[in-house]
């Protein structure tokens, strides 16, 4: 967890036991999976509003972004393993997505809208590219996981570099 607490400032400590927890895997048919060179996309199937070809085109843009980040920082996170982008209903309210591997993309926030914008406007997807930018922070690459507020700006700096290097588009609509 986060050492500084959650968005509401709470910190939990100690031990707790549950004896009624049941993990139920999502059925494979409920998930939409596509894979690029560096990125794996696993979304709720009902959120995917565009064609496989459109998703593949977006994944290609995300792969190019990954490569631009690699060129910028001189290294890759997670020993070069593919980064998964995973829909989840289970992240804290107020978060659009959380960086890591997987990048957790809130199922309740703009999934279909972002996919539609990639087709309609050629938009590369601010939120996801921003989160991939976090993955390329020094703390993530070095494995320390250290993060601070400065990286909110630096994730956007890395994103700006990648968009410029890849001739990418970020819509303001």
What are these regions (language model features)?
Residues 4, 25, 139-140, 157:
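Residues that line or immediately flank small-molecule/substrate-binding pockets and catalytic motifs
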Residues 11, 53, 76-78, 122, ...:
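Structural helix-adjacent loops and short alpha-helical linkers that scaffold large soluble proteins
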Residues 14, 62, 148-152:
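Active-site-proximal structural scaffolding
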């Amino acid at each position: 967890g986060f050492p500084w607490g959650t968005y509401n400032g709470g910190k939990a400590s100690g031990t707790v036991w549950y004896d009624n927890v049941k993990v139920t895997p999502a059925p494979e048919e409920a998930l939409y999976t596509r894979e690029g060179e560096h990125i794996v996309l696993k979304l709720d199937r009902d959120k995917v509003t565009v064609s496989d070809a459109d998703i593949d085109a977006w994944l290609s843009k995300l792969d190019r972004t990954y490569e631009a980040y690699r060129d910028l920082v001189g290294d890759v996170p997670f020993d070069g393993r593919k980064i998964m982008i995973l829909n989840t209903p289970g992240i804290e309210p107020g978060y659009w997505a959380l960086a890591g591997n997987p990048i957790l993309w809130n199922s309740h926030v703009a999934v279909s809208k972002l996919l539609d914008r990639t087709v309609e406007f050629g938009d590369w997807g601010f939120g996801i590219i921003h989160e991939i930018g976090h993955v390329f922070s020094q703390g993530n690459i070095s494995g320390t996981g250290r993060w601070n507020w400065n990286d909110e700006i630096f994730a956007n700096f890395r994103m700006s570099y990648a968009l410029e290097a890849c001739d990418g588009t970020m819509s303001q609509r």
